[in-house]
Amino acid sequence: MSRYTGPSWKVSRRLGISLTGTGKELARRPYAPGDHGQNNRRKISEYGMQLREKQKLRMMYGLTERQFSNLFVRAGKIREGLPGTNFMVLLERRLDNMVYRLGLATTRRQARQLVNHGHITVDGKRVDIPSYEVEIGQVIGVREKSKDLKIISEAVEAVVGRPQFVQFDADKLEGSLVRLPQRDELEADIDDSLIVEYYNKL
């Protein structure tokens, strides 16, 4: 399955989440496209709830189905911790997500484009693979020739706050993962136990 590249607001309304992180998609019409209010929503089966939760998280991080399921398998091989939490931590460690968390991009989609176009470095070396897994202490920065990009400066200026598991130097436009995130620091509106149940039934 290919990565969805269409209008994010339609998916946001259908799944009941803000993929952009701004919440604007849900502000005016907090119901799915085609519905005319919450009364038209049909009761969802247990499987439907599991599937929707999986789709919410997959769309939130912008992964293909294959990327998403492969990462879940990897999380299941980690002996310590809960599978759902381990899965979400692996998602967080993706380079495109870390660029977003550091505030170098306003959305994960924008962060993925910055990585794809070669604007991002890891420990001083250009890395253009969004799925690159960031290790604790690695320095994520912006290429020297890309530091004047308006899209990056506007993103940094718009940051209200950053997660406690990252640190960022605004002058150098670089930061790092200082520790692995705790579950309560990640997406609160995601029930990862439903995702675990979904994949366990396959």
Curated annotation (Swiss-Prot):
* UniProt keyword list: Ribonucleoprotein, Ribosomal protein, RNA-binding, rRNA-binding
Q: How does it assemble?
A: Part of the 30S ribosomal subunit. Contacts protein S5. The interaction surface between S4 and S5 is involved in control of translational fidelity.
Please name the Gene3D superfamilies in this protein's record. Answer: Ribosomal Protein S4 Delta 41, Chain A, domain 1, RNA-binding S4 domain
Q: Family per UniProt?
A: Belongs to the universal ribosomal protein uS4 family.
Give TM segment ranges: none
Task: Briefly state the protein's biological role.
Answer: One of the primary rRNA binding proteins, it binds directly to 16S rRNA where it nucleates assembly of the body of the 30S subunit. With S5 and S12 plays an important role in translational accuracy.
> Biological process GO annotation list?
ribosomal small subunit biogenesis; translation
List, alphabetically, the GO terms of the cellular component aspect: small ribosomal subunit
GO molecular function (one): structural constituent of ribosome
Under the heading SMART domains, the entry gives:
Ribosomal_S4 (SM01390), S4 (SM00363)
Classification via Pfam families: Ribosomal_S4 (PF00163), S4 (PF01479)
Q: Which domain of life is it from?
A: Bacteria
State the organism named in the record.
Answer: Pediococcus pentosaceus (strain ATCC 25745 / CCUG 21536 / LMG 10740 / 183-1w)
The UniProt record lists the S4 RNA-binding domain at 93-156
Q: Does the keyword Ribosomal protein apply?
A: yes
Q: Which PANTHER family match?
A: 30S 40S RIBOSOMAL PROTEIN (PTHR11831), SMALL RIBOSOMAL SUBUNIT PROTEIN US4M (PTHR11831:SF4)
**Protein's UniProt name:** Small ribosomal subunit protein uS4
What InterPro entries does its record include? Ribosomal_uS4, Ribosomal_uS4_bac-type, Ribosomal_uS4_CS, Ribosomal_uS4_N, S4_RNA-bd, S4_RNA-bd_sf
